[in-house]
Amino acid sequence: SCMKAAPMKEVSIRGQGSLAYPGLRTQGNLETLSGPNDATRGLTSLADTFEHVIEELLDEQQVIQPSKENKDADLYSSRVMLSSQVPLEPPLLFLLEEYKNYLDAANMSMRVRRHSDPARRGELSVCDSTSEWVTAAEKKTAVDMSGATVTVLEKVPVPKGQLKQYFYETKCSSKGYAKEGCRGIDKRYWNSQCRTTQSYVRALTMDNKKRVGWRFIRI
């Protein structure tokens, strides 16, 4: 992930993996609305609905814990996805994790912070970043939690065939403020730098003894 700098000499951020999320379904449309005022009220209502759904998902995420009987529950990660093709959108768990981290950092209730969201105030990120899905064909190897180099398996066997492992990587942008310093930091008093940090995700790998298993690796 791309480190978001602050007016201090060093900042360390470590992400946390998510385990599971419930289903998501929304109802309602704008076809029955009439007039600009009704449309505005309708759009506001839909926005509140989506925010309410996010709040419910985050509440559910606090409750859900992997049971001993469900040994696969801890194999889910916010930055890893098994799919037959390249995912078209960022992982939902990752978006929920980012939103939750923002709320936690604010140390305020969701409903209070909802109306002071940076996106609503037109704020810019301290560091620009880019995110993309990559496969094991591009990663080849990685380092696990014990410091050993393991081979990242490109395909994962499933009952009806094989699925590819995709990793959602976020890096600091090579353009803009990555080299010039962080946005919003007074250069007269502070030295700042945007740099890409690593986080652990769980992936299917093989060690040097040909043992295949799910391990935490750095991406």
Swiss-Prot record:
Main location per the UniProt record: secreted
GO CC, any one term: synaptic vesicle
Disulphides: 127-194
MF terms (GO), sorted A to Z: growth factor activity; nerve growth factor receptor binding
Signal sequence range: 1-5
Gene Ontology biological process terms, A to Z: cell surface receptor protein tyrosine kinase signaling pathway; modulation of chemical synaptic transmission; negative regulation of neuron apoptotic process; nerve development; nerve growth factor signaling pathway; neuron projection morphogenesis
Pfam families on file: NGF
Propeptide residue intervals: 6-114
Residues that carry a glycan: 107
Keywords carried by this UniProt record: Cleavage on pair of basic residues, Disulfide bond, Glycoprotein, Growth factor, Secreted, Signal
Subcellular location: Secreted
Entry similarity comment: Belongs to the NGF-beta family.
Role according to the record: Promotes the survival of neuronal populations that are all located either in the central nervous system or directly connected to it.
Name recorded for this polypeptide: Neurotrophic factor BDNF precursor form
Source organism (scientific name): Loxocemus bicolor
Lineage: Eukaryota, Metazoa, Chordata, Craniata, Vertebrata
